[in-house]
């Protein structure tokens, strides 16, 4: 097992810098998820750690050893890809053991490791099948098995569930998490799916445009997002953002409604309200002109606008709720659930 250090890491292609001074400490045995939208640099960062991309400047350390110039084969890592990367003419057993065979391991050692990994992943009955005879989830287990037999210091996962349907993704992400906890191997996982990130990671590194927006636990990112980007990216449905002004511990919305909160902050802010924190209240200060009810079974999402404005607002209510278009509904929100951001910098305002 291994700790990993990213120190002032920069990646450029020609004159274009795509990763900007990335810093991060990953502890031994930790499961880290790098999450962000398409094109943010998350897969590039993972490939740099793997040794598949060169480092422009900065250092990558594995177990306190700088590995910038080490070949991938010498970094003691194993990678699981989105497209499985299985050899179609080989059996599952041969696919899982092929890397060990190339490294010169004995046949007995290869068979032992493959059998152990197959037992962990519950694919022992498929060892003599070809990949074409397997489902997508089974193929992904084989790809993970190929990584496990290596007995590496670090697992790297590059969006391994993207090709699976929604139900199977939920099942497989739970299996990956249980597997990582069982093996205790330091793991880095890349995804664009914030729900996947929240359920898998001990900590999340949120990337945006090649910059680290925030690096913390899922709960830290949910409860105290450091920037507008993190606030809007983490959580489903997304946080509501309303123009507001703070004065003397009161928050005034653009339609004149006033909410208690804001602490010692003052001036114009972007106010963030999570839909699930809006509580139906006939005397509440937040009045929403409902345009659409989205029935999801356990909850109902009410989509509309802050009354008297064009600012969109979504409320999440438990159970089954119906409201005709144009219905005015009032909501209250606890002061501790208000999030305030500087409208110029996008950074969280000190409370």
From Swiss-Prot:
Q: Does the record carry tRNA processing as a key word?
A: no
Share what the entry says about its subunit structure, partners included: The complex is composed of two ATP-binding proteins (UgpC), two transmembrane proteins (UgpA and UgpE) and a solute-binding protein (UgpB).
What InterPro entries does its record include? AAA+_ATPase, ABC_transporter-like_ATP-bd, ABC_transporter-like_CS, ABC_transpr_MalK-like, ABC_transpr_MalK/UgpC-like, Mo/tungstate-bd_C_term_dom, NA-bd_OB-fold, OB_MalK-like
Tell me the gene name.
ugpC
Question: SUPFAM superfamilies in the record, alphabetically?
Answer: MOP-like, P-loop containing nucleoside triphosphate hydrolases
What is this protein called in UniProt? sn-glycerol-3-phosphate import ATP-binding protein UgpC
Query: Where primarily located?
Result: membrane
Q: Which GO terms describe its cellular component?
A: ATP-binding cassette (ABC) transporter complex, substrate-binding subunit-containing
Query: What does the record give as the function of this protein?
Result: Part of the ABC transporter complex UgpBAEC involved in sn-glycerol-3-phosphate (G3P) import. Responsible for energy coupling to the transport system.
Where does it localize? Cell inner membrane
Signal sequence extent: none
List the top taxonomic levels of the source: Bacteria, Pseudomonadati, Pseudomonadota, Alphaproteobacteria, Rhodobacterales
């Amino acid at each position: 097992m291994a700790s990993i250090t990213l120190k002032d890491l920069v990646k450029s292609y020609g004159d274009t810098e795509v990763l900007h001074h990335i810093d991060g400490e990953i502890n031994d045995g930790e499961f880290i998820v790098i999450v962000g939208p398409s094109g943010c640099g998350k897969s590039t960062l993972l490939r740099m750690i793997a040794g598949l991309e060169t480092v422009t400047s900065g250092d990558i350390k594995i177990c306190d050893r700088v590995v910038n110039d080490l070949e991938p084969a010498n970094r003691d890592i194993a990678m699981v890809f989105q497209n499985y990367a299985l050899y179609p003419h080989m059996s599952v057993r041969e696919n899982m053991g092929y890397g060990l065979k190339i490294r010169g391991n004995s046949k007995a050692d290869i068979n032992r490791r493959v059998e152990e990994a197959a037992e962990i992943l519950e694919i022992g009955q498929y060892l003599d099948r070809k990949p074409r005879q397997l489902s997508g989830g089974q193929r992904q287990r084989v790809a993970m098995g190929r990584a496990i037999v290596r007995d590496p210091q670090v697992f790297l996962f590059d969006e391994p569930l993207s090709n699976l349907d929604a139900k199977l993704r939920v099942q497989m992400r739970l299996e990956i998490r249980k597997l990582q906890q069982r093996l205790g191997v330091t793991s880095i996982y890349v995804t664009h799916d914030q729900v996947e990130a929240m359920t898998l990671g001990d900590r999340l590194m949120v990337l945006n445009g090649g910059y680290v927006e925030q690096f913390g636990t899922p709960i830290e990112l949910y409860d105290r997002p450091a920037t507008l980007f993190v606030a809007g990216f983490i959580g489903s449905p997304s946080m509501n953002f309303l123009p507001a002004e703070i004065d003397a511990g009161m928050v005034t919305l653009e339609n004149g409604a006033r909410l208690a909160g804001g602490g010692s902050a003052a001036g114009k802010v972007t106010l963030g309200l999570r839909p699930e924190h809006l509580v139906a209240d006939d005397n509440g200060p937040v009045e929403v002109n409902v345009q659409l009810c989205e029935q999801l079974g356990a909850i109902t999402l009410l989509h509309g606008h802050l009354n008297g404005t064009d600012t969109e607002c979504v409320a999440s209510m438990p159970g089954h709720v119906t409201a005709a278009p144009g219905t005015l509904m009032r909501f209250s929100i606890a002061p501790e659930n208000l999030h305030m951001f500087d409208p110029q910098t996008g950074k969280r305002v000190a409370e």
